[in-house]
Amino acid sequence: MARLPFDNDIKTLRFLAGEMTQGDLGDRVGVTRQTIAAIEQGKYSPSLEVAFRIARVFGKPLEEVFRWAED
């Protein structure tokens, strides 16, 4: 499976937020730990709603969490 055309900083943001676990983030966003892991690894594209919820948890604008990958 090919990686998605965007990157994210979720893992870094989780670490900076007191080493928040994938499960903790999933609970706050309303998705499973497995979904957070897949998003972090670029294997799953979150819905726009989930992307905004993730950004809100960290108090960041969407473009500071997700960005287009450079070729």
Place the predicted regions along the sequence by residue:
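A detector for short, charged/polar N-terminal pre-domain segments
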Residues: M1-P5
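Short basic helix-loop element that most often maps to the first helix and adjoining turn
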Residues: D9-R28
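DNA major-groove recognition helix of helix-turn-helix
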Residues: R14, E40, A69
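Residues within helix-turn-helix
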Residues: G23, Q34, E63
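Recognition helix of helix-turn-helix/homeodomain-like DNA-binding domains
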Residues: G30-S45
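DNA major-groove recognition helix of helix-turn-helix/homeodomain DNA-binding modules
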Residues: E49-E64
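Short amphipathic recognition helices of helix-turn-helix/homeodomain-type DNA-binding modules
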Residues: E64-D71
